[in-house]
Amino acid sequence: MAAEGKNVLIMAGGTGGHVFPALACAREFQARGYSVHWLGTPRGIENELVPQAGLPLHLIQVSGLRGKGKLSLLKAPFTLVKAVLQARRIIRQLKPVCVLGFGGYVTGPGGVAARLCGVPLVIHEQNARAGTANRLLVPLSARVCEAFPNTFEASDKRRTTGNPVRPELFMDAQRTPLGERRARLLVLGGSLGAEPLNKLLPKALSEVPAALRPEVFHQAGKQHAPITAERYHEAGVAAQVEPFIKDMAQAYGWADLVVCRAGALTVSELAAAGLPSMLVPLPHAIDDHQTHNAQYLAREGAAFLMPQATTGAAQLAERLNEVLMQPEKLNVMAGTARRLAKPAATSTVVDICLEVAHG
């Protein structure tokens, strides 16, 4: 354990969208000489990623309430009180100078416990529409960080920081000018794949004239890669289909255009990589946050927002034809995306935490 006054507690769990930006901040804290501890729950992805990063993981028992039965709802107050007490015990033991929350079920009880222990609380919201836990924790927080402008109401606490993303994404890709080669299309559906995109892209690309058709690199998810490859074959479209892309920085560096969902980190990574995109938000995301994320790039002209309900193969093919016939349009969109990036997001969030800890 680090010397007293050098511990930081990070709270993040459930999905990679919460955990990956938190890990980026953890590395920055460590680079500045702080010992980072992690608060999570037993079921989230943090149980795999945090130990892999060599960080001590502390667990509390808490889960979400959406879609739960009446018995679970009746038990909820007792479960939450128990989780707060568990988190308070951990905070008292670690004596962190600051608690930094990135969302997930763990953040609510952990944030309340931080306030009870008198430890400064900073929250970071990755999406353009704030999650429930972060919205409720605003009054208890010393600072509220937002990835996208105006996610929270204006106040002295609010700071627009961007999302912490991998620094290698900000490196300029040395691409051959578009007029001298075929365009390159990257299709992303997340690590598990997005089956509607897997079905849509082969059909849409078959309607793009062969002379204009881009090279295609498609991440389809482990379960869906074989059938997606078969769909491309049946459509007469050449494509490289993979279950999962391990080196996203390389994939972004290769691409000229991306078709994907609109998760918070994906949107931030597209800006960091300076890539134009066609964003098809997940229709059933909580609070429709993916549509709000997509609007951030679309409003500025860095992306096209294409709702799944109204985007068929013909509509997507029409949009692809439009940009593939105008390479200069892709170049303008790429420049706009890069201008929206926040390369200092990680260091800014850590600066804010240490400011409230020692200020």
Curated annotation (Swiss-Prot):
Coiled coil: none annotated. It is an enzyme of class 2 (transferase). The keyword Metal-binding does not apply. It is a peripheral membrane protein. It is found in: Cell inner membrane. It catalyses: di-trans,octa-cis-undecaprenyl diphospho-N-acetyl-alpha-D-muramoyl-L-alanyl-D-glutamyl-meso-2,6-diaminopimeloyl-D-alanyl-D-alanine + UDP-N-acetyl-alpha-D-glucosamine = di-trans,octa-cis-undecaprenyl diphospho-[N-acetyl-alpha-D-glucosaminyl-(1->4)]-N-acetyl-alpha-D-muramoyl-L-alanyl-D-glutamyl-meso-2,6-diaminopimeloyl-D-alanyl-D-alanine + UDP + H(+). This is UDP-N-acetylglucosamine--N-acetylmuramyl-(pentapeptide) pyrophosphoryl-undecaprenol N-acetylglucosamine transferase. The lineage of its organism: Bacteria, Pseudomonadati, Pseudomonadota, Gammaproteobacteria, Pseudomonadales.
